[in-house]
Amino acid sequence: MKNTSDYGVLMMNLGTPDAPQTPEVRRYLREFLSDSRVVDLNPLIWKPILNLIILTIRPPKVAKIYQQVWMDEGSPLLVLSERLKEKVKEALSEKKGQTVPVELAMTYGNPSVEVAANKLREQGVKNIIVIPMYPQFSATTTAAAYDRLMKSLKNCPHWPSLQLLHDYADHPMYIKALSNSVRAQWDKQGERRHLVLSYHGIPKRYVTNGDPYARRCETTSRLVAEELELGDHEWTHVYQSRFGREEWLKPYADATLKALPSMGVKKINIISPAFSIDCIETLEEVTLELGDEFKNNGGLAFDYIPALNDTPDQVALYVNLIEQNSKQWT
């Protein structure tokens, strides 16, 4: 197969510690929480809190959580992202009849953006399609990925041409893929259940200041509900992962799941559309913490619907996104 593709692809996800141990988790959290896109507080206030309190208390606790979900091959986020990358590369190369360079990078941690970008350069890539693996745009995720990419190219003598994907919150193939996952779960369990769509939260202040994330999440939920022909009483939209005392996007997932049984909703399925790949937030927070919250307050059945991961639907979606963004080079 020829290696003369007109472009290469850089897939970017958030990041993960190198190991489920306290030192590695502390190193990762320091990099992640030092990004002003993630925490935009005055550094004179935030840095002492981060270094003296959070990075002292949180790493041992978070390391134990990672140990519960760690796979034999490594971090679930990295392992599953790599699997998706390889399948996307194979599918793209087969369609084009030539090898298409595809690399994976993490905004924080490894593989770094610098390493991934260098690999593309070494393969002679002059045009790069950048695919942040976040279905709903947010400055805290997608823009942070762009920042890291631009920083990595700062000292590059010859910049490649870049095509940056904004998001795909309303892409028909994405909505269809999520809906297919829900239908498959319903078939497996032999019944339709109330569907909870849970998204990673961000401070409400960010949205007030212009971040479109909440609107994009709401769009995804509405389209999935329409695709599944759900009535308003058959689905619920929530936000998880609240941190600190500041008000975040509502409704809060934990409070909502605690209340649902008293409203007559005893059986639910929950899906997290904002996560293209399963990770600590889905495998531990959703599956275990939110599941316990629901069942401890009268819920009878709780089943998490996995992220799209490296499924054929997600591979086809990413191939389509790449093809749509490569037209000027093909």
UniProtKB/Swiss-Prot annotation:
It comes from the Bacteria. GO terms for cellular component: cytoplasm. The keyword Lyase applies. GO terms for biological process: heme biosynthetic process. Catalyzes the ferrous insertion into protoporphyrin IX. HAMAP family: Ferrochelatase. This is Ferrochelatase. It comes from Marinomonas sp. (strain MWYL1).
